[in-house]
């Protein structure tokens, strides 16, 4: 088992979980700022947004996690704020971040679709890296399996939990998000019929579908009417993504690649 603490500085413990999240954030900010001028968005506005959105998204992710495990946390109130032990729900962070983005874009007079489109691939790569925090914490894993011989030894050993090998669902989602990120980079450079909002829609559909499938492998999620709560939210994301494509096509939204860039 790998030590979840990366660096120990006296009483201060810096955990791999935090490093994975922060690394993903830094890379996401860099990529978003790099693409921002293409959509006539000031890069400094991206930094201003992150300073507001990131802490609120962390709070939203934790609140979502605590709410759906309230039976436990109502008896362990002191652990509600112990985010260093894990327990950040991505959907809670996404919902909070989207709300903050909408308000921020409105106040800065930035087109919300443009902001979402340049942020979507960055969010995907941040999620891909962030999932490795679950790996170090030995959480968000799947059902038991006979062996994991197809995986590198360090992953196989870390996924040996409570006397059994577990499906490395963190890895599946990380790779799925990485592939989605790569596809978006290709689409937004090569697909000339890509309209404003289409990248956001692709993110919602791609992530929603992958999460719905992978979530079915997990054993630690809350069930609701035969599906896990996260799977229901995945269905919502997929439906929302499809609606965005239809809506933007019908209103003939501007193309992502402008005539000046062709």
UniProtKB/Swiss-Prot annotation:
Sequence positions that bind a 1,2-diacyl-sn-glycero-3-phospho-(1'-sn-glycerol): 131
Protein name: Phosphatidylglycerol--prolipoprotein diacylglyceryl transferase
Pfam families assigned to the protein according to its UniProt record, in alphabetical order: LGT
Single Gene Ontology MF annotation: phosphatidylglycerol-prolipoprotein diacylglyceryl transferase activity
Key words of the record: Cell membrane, Membrane, Transferase, Transmembrane, Transmembrane helix
Alphabetized InterPro entries for the sequence: Lgt
Function, in words: Catalyzes the transfer of the diacylglyceryl group from phosphatidylglycerol to the sulfhydryl group of the N-terminal cysteine of a prolipoprotein, the first step in the formation of mature lipoproteins.
PROSITE patterns found in the cross-reference section: LGT
Pathway: Protein modification; lipoprotein biosynthesis (diacylglyceryl transfer)
Lipid bilayer topology: Multi-pass membrane protein
Domain of life according to the entry: Bacteria
Membrane-spanning segments: 9-29, 41-61, 80-100, 109-129, 167-187, 197-217, 226-246
EC number: 2.5.1.145
High-level lineage: Bacteria, Bacillati, Bacillota, Bacilli, Lactobacillales
Gene Ontology CC, one term: plasma membrane
Family label: Belongs to the Lgt family.
Compartments, as annotated in UniProt: Cell membrane
A biological-process GO annotation: lipoprotein biosynthetic process
């Amino acid at each position: 088992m790998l030590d979840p603490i990366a660096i120990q500085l006296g009483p201060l413990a810096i955990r791999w979980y935090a490093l994975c999240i922060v690394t993903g954030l830094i890379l996401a900010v860099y990529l978003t700022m790099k693409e921002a001028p293409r959509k006539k968005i000031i890069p400094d506005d991206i930094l201003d947004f992150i300073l507001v959105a990131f802490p609120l998204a962390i709070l939203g992710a934790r609140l979502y996690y605590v709410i759906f495990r309230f039976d436990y946390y109502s008896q362990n109130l002191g652990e509600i704020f112990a985010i260093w032990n894990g327990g950040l729900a991505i959907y809670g962070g996404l919902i909070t971040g989207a709300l903050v983005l909408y308000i921020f874009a409105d106040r800065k007079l930035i087109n919300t679709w443009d902001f979402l489109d340049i942020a979507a691939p960055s969010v995907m790569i941040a999620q891909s890296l962030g999932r490795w925090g679950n790996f170090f914490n030995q959480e968000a894993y799947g059902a038991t399996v006979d062996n994991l011989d197809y995986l590198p030894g360090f992953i196989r050993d870390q996924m040996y939990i409570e006397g059994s090998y577990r499906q490395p669902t963190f890895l599946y989602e990380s790779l799925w998000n990485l592939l989605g990120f790569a596809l978006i980079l290709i689409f937004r450079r090569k697909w000339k019929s890509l309209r404003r909002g289409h990248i956001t829609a692709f993110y919602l559909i791609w992530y929603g579908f992958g999460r719905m499938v992978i979530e079915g492998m997990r054993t630690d999620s809350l069930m609701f009417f035969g599906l896990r709560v996260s799977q229901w939210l995945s269905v919502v994301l997929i439906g929302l993504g499809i609606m965005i494509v239809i809506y933007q096509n019908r209103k003939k939204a501007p193309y992502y690649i402008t005539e000046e860039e062709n």
